[in-house]
Amino acid sequence: AGMVFRNNIDWLANQYNECRMGSSMFSYLLGYQDPRLSAYFEASPSAYAVAAFDGKNYQAVPPGNANQQNTIYTDFSKPNITSNTPTYWMRASEVYFLRAEAALRWGSEFGDAEALYEQGVATSFDENGISSSVDDYLASGLTPIAHNMRASYYSYNAAAPTTATPAFS
């Protein structure tokens, strides 16, 4: 029909400057040393970006944004998406996580919650081209981090959102 596909998140992130990594996501990905970090977000050229375990620098947006022009956060870490990246309604990994939640909530007739959760993590690694060991990730014992976010016009202390580890239990 002559229509050209363009990823809608790319449009929000790169044309409107309305989509950047938030502080909670930053806490989880850095704290867990999650190998999907660079698959999810681009490094930041900001002078205030934080060095991560993958050797790149990232900067997250604090909660709330009153800037109507969306010009403050242009150099912060944005989704690692181009106009040609497929838009997924729901990925297979998310289905495994939903099934794990159903098994926890309504019982084993929905499957083994732990096995479904771990399959969700493994599938997510595969979907994002990550070759790191899922077993090592799940057994890491790491937790989300508290961190300070700064720029020339603010400083924000973000508490760790939880003490949960990547392990199921």
What do these predicted regions represent?
Residues 1-99, 105, 110-169:
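Hydrophobic-face positions in mid-chain alpha helices that act as interaction patches
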